[in-house]
């Protein structure tokens, strides 16, 4: 571990936290018959509906192929509807999808917030948010190094 820079240690910590948090969220969301990815997709659809599959894929952490399969499943379960508007197919929540999200949302947000609320005060949380936002914005512009 001596060769690691503080930046690489932060990156490893973020990866481990993300994996652990996703595993725990998946377990938590089982009580609502949802996965973390499905919850995220439903929340993004509700926030931006109607939207195309391509627009949705840009907003979530699921691959294009994974989005396709997930949308098919969510449509079969009655949570979403896909409508063809001339050349564009848009996605919206159904009443059933809205109800599922409303049941899960408050509890999932409280669960996720507890990761931070339990150990960081409000000022520390704001600082962490600002730092992560700064790193995220930089990462969106970052290019791969030349070979």
Curated annotation (Swiss-Prot):
Residues 53-76 bind DNA. It comes from Bacillus cereus (strain ATCC 10987 / NRS 248). Disulfide bonds: none annotated. CDD domains: HTH_ARSR. The keyword Transcription regulation applies. The keyword Transcription applies. GO terms for molecular function: DNA binding; DNA-binding transcription factor activity. It comes from the Bacteria. It holds the Pfam family MarR. This is Uncharacterized HTH-type transcriptional regulator BCE_2019. Residues 1-137 form the HTH marR-type domain. Keywords: DNA-binding, Transcription, Transcription regulation.
